[in-house]
Amino acid sequence: MSSIKSISDGLVLDTEQEAWLQGWLSKFGAWVYSGRLEKRQSSIIAEFMATVEKRDYPEREMCNDDDGMLITKVVDKIYHIDRAAFTLLLLRYAFVSSDRAIARYYYGIAQPRQMVRRNRTLEYRKPSMATCRREVKEIIRSAEYLIYPHLYNAFKIRDSEWKKKNNDKNVLTSLNQ
């Protein structure tokens, strides 16, 4: 028996964590889509953005450059783990693609594989659109589950460093008085 649990085994974010993460990823997606991410900063995301066609969206809330670069470092880890998951995340958050549009993309790149039919026989075939929709949903949830602790810790570390830096300045200015 495998020791790795699937999403259905309880490895999901709670509502509060999910809202926090999706808020930051949405701001990050708007930041990436705006073109503020330079190629020299993150070639992985910039390379992907160069391959897709941009669409006009109403003004979306965007994170600042410091937050964007911090999130980029965390999201780039997903690229090295699973490129398909990375692409699906960018489609969801940078291009604000619907679940169906993401599933259509995933269906287009899906390779035939051995699948169990309703009569419990194995057959080598391409997954259906419904299967792709379910898989996309699970892949995005899994990627978000992987990103959350790293992103939360990155923000926490950055905030504590910022507070320490400001406290050091306050100590120095109080000594001068």
Residue ranges and their predicted role:
Residues 130, 134:
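Key DNA-contact positions within bacterial/archaeal DNA-binding proteins
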